């Protein structure tokens, strides 16, 4: 039942099918004044058409907000996440998850500015995004009213949604096969495709699903070799050319795309309890992760590196589940950021037919001591004879256990 007390609602609006229907539904069911927010996250398509669609749906010009947030997205969300080498369930680089808190933050800021008493999103009632959006809303504005149409209206499937769209003359985009498109999410970090034939995890994804990369087998026969410069854990330059965060990630995406890097077909465990299959493309992020681990390998102490690796799965779960604004994520971030103080230097990377290989790394803060590790003779701080006592001390408890077991 619609809450008729809601007067103004800020809708996260893409201009696509779902949010176009939601816009009309909010106007008719709630009788509310709708304010739209459209974020340019680097999704690779023009977002200005969203303005025309909102106007055509009766939204006042002053209630239409379109903002280019690419630099903020990469600087304040993507890069902090990559300082942690964040990977969910060993594979997923969290391209969708990391965009939701920024959108939620912008909606709340607009709601405060415009005096809106509610916010709304287009996430379905089965997915993770509903959780991510709403935890973001409540984490920033605890008393805000949240309208989640997919949990309220009578549409139970995408087919019913298409019927509603046709009835109300809402434009339905088509892909080149003449069918309604896959469920797609895209931003500067990644693109994802779900639904239709992808719902069967036994069936290989058709090639036309991939939007961001060429097939690895079609990539050039010669490798591409680049350098990436880091300062305090963040990439700042490619091949010696300084770039802004969004520009740098865009360039890495282009390099990854041309070399077939960053494709991923996985089944993941959603926070809401079910498994889902998706096809992800994260070309620039895949390169960045490998390069960052490369520079950390010579600048981080073993203890700090191993502790970071232990903390990373928890950090990844917090991001995946929507707890970006939680104190525990901020605590972990503080520790991770502290670890990055000396993560500065240059990494050389080879891109070849879907593979990313670190082939060189250097840093003014390197902990790698060539004199110490060399097999050649020389004056070094390491005495081979010391290893005997080290081994015996570490073996002590194992020897005690073995003696007990021998006694029976």
From Swiss-Prot:
Keywords: Amino-acid biosynthesis, Arginine biosynthesis, ATP-binding, Cytoplasm, Ligase, Nucleotide-binding. InterPro entries: Arginosuc_syn_C (IPR048268), Arginosuc_syn_N (IPR048267), Arginosuc_synth (IPR001518), Arginosuc_synth_CS (IPR018223), Arginosuc_synth_type_1_subfam (IPR023434), AS_cat/multimer_dom_body (IPR024074), Rossmann-like_a/b/a_fold (IPR014729). L-citrulline binds at residues 92, 97, 128, 132, 183, 192, 268, 280. Its EC number is 6.3.4.5. One of its GO terms (biological process) is L-arginine biosynthetic process. Belongs to the argininosuccinate synthase family. Type 1 subfamily. Homotetramer. This is Argininosuccinate synthase. It comes from Caulobacter vibrioides (strain NA1000 / CB15N).
């Amino acid at each position: 039942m619609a809450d008729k007390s809601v007067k103004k609602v800020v809708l996260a609006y893409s201009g696509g099918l779902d949010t176009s229907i939601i816009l009309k539904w909010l106007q008719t069911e709630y009788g509310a004044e709708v304010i739209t927010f459209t974020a340019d996250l680097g999704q690779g398509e023009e977002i200005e058409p969203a303005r025309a669609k909102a106007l055509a749906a009766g939204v006042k010009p002053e209630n239409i907000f379109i903002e280019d947030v690419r630099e903020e997205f990469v600087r304040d969300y993507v890069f902090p996440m990559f300082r942690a080498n964040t990977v969910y369930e060993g594979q997923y680089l969290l391209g969708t998850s990391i965009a939701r808190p920024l959108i939620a933050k912008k909606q709340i800021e607009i709601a405060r500015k415009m005096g809106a008493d509610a916010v709304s999103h287009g996430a379905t009632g089965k997915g993770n995004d509903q959780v991510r959006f709403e935890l973001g809303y409540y984490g920033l504005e605890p008393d805000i009213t949240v309208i989640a149409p997919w949990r309220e209206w009578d549409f139970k499937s995408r087919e019913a949604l298409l019927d509603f769209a046709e009835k109300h003359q809402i434009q339905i985009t088509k892909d080149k096969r003449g069918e309604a498109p896959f469920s797609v999410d895209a931003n500067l970090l990644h693109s994802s495709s779900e639904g239709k034939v992808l719902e069967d995890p036994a069936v290989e994804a058709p090639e036309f699903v991939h939007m961001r990369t060429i097939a690895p087998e079609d990539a050039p026969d010669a490798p591409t070799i680049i350098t990436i410069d880091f300062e305090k854990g963040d990439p700042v330059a490619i091949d010696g050319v300084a770039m802004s965060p969004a520009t740098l990630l865009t360039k890495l995406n282009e390099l990854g795309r041309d070399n077939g890097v960053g494709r991923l077909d996985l089944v993941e465990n959603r926070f809401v309890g079910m498994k889902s299959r998706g096809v992800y493309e994260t070309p620039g992020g895949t390169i960045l992760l490998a390069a960052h681990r490369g520079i950390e390998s010579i600048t981080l102490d073993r203890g700090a590196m191993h502790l970071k690796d232990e903390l990373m799965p928890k950090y990844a779960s917090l991001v995946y589940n929507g707890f970006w604004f939680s104190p525990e994520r901020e605590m972990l971030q503080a520790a991770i950021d502290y670890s990055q103080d000396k993560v500065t230097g240059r990494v050389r990377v080879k891109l070849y037919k879907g593979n990313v290989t670190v082939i060189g790394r250097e840093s003014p803060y390197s902990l790698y001591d060539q004199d110490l590790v060399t097999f050649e003779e020389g004056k070094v701080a390491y005495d081979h004879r010391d290893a005997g006592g080290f081994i015996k001390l570490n073996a002590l408890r194992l020897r005690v256990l073995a003696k007990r077991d021998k006694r029976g």
